[in-house]
Amino acid sequence: MFGRHSIIPNNQIGTASASAGEDHVSASATSGHIPYDDMEEIPHPDSIYGAASDLIPDGSQLVAHRSDGSELLVSRPPEGANQLTISFRGQVYVFDAVGADKVDAVLSLLGGSTELAPGPQVMELAQQQNHMPVVEYQSRCSLPQRAQSLDRFRKKRNARCFEKKVRYGVRQEVALRMARNKGQFTSSKMTDGAYNSGTDQDSAQDDAHPEISCTHCGISSKCTPMMRRGPSGPRTLCNACGLFWANRGTLRDLSKKTEENQLALMKPDDGGSVADAANNLNTEAASVEEHTSMVSLANGDNSNLLGDH
């Protein structure tokens, strides 16, 4: 019933000319709509309880149904008239030849009650959100209940998962307290390999430790990148000997290093001779052997003598 009759806007309901008066009467009889001759008869939404009652036939009763964004009046005259009058937001529509069975079918479809009270029958039609688009009005935002609901929602949204959030100020404070090495975060416990040369921090660390020599090859701690752990404890081997010990579990053979040095010294330069190279080789070998013997005697370990190897 309601699907076949569309809502007529206010600008289409007006006064007809005298020459077309009969055409309007015949058209209204065919379509079921009864036009009104004066726009002032159409009630305004603000005065829907006053002016709309003048347009309803005598003997009918009005019940206004107010929902969110809807103002609807449904009226049926006494028995035998079979005329349905609907007033919605200032527009009045009258439908003829509307039986009670059609009204019951529409109400059952919209979820209304199908039981009609005796006497003047007045029905309320509620706007269903599932069947009709809901129109949002600005007046809803001004309601105090709406404002309180929005306030509760904002508070709940701000408090959601608050324990999992870490503020940036706290993270920055923790980052400032952490130890850094060349801009990178490092552990608070300094490792054995944290002493490098070439920076002020490394120089200060080198000054804190006295100069020592490798217990295996006798090189000074200032001539190696870092001192490493050996069989005698930490900082007892140079970088080369410590890496060899950590990878293979044995100390490296210094005789191979001596042979390499000999071959390098035996190669004559442009302005030298083979005899000069041999003399230099003997001098270097004697100095290395003497230095190694002194280091071994100082550490009390006679097994590290060059002759034993």
UniProtKB/Swiss-Prot annotation:
Domain Tify intervals: 77-112
Gene name in the database record: GATA25
Protein's UniProt name: GATA transcription factor 25
Stored InterPro entries: CCT_domain, TIFY-like, Tify_dom, Znf_GATA, Znf_NHR/GATA
SUPFAM superfamilies linked: Glucocorticoid receptor-like (DNA-binding domain)
SMART domains linked: TIFY, ZnF_GATA
Entry similarity comment: Belongs to the type IV zinc-finger family. Class C subfamily.
GO MF annotation terms: identical protein binding; sequence-specific DNA binding; zinc ion binding
Segments of this protein annotated with the region Disordered: 1-35, 187-207, 290-309
UniProt entry keywords in alphabetical sequence: Activator, DNA-binding, Metal-binding, Nucleus, Transcription, Transcription regulation, Zinc, Zinc-finger
GO biological process: one example: regulation of DNA-templated transcription
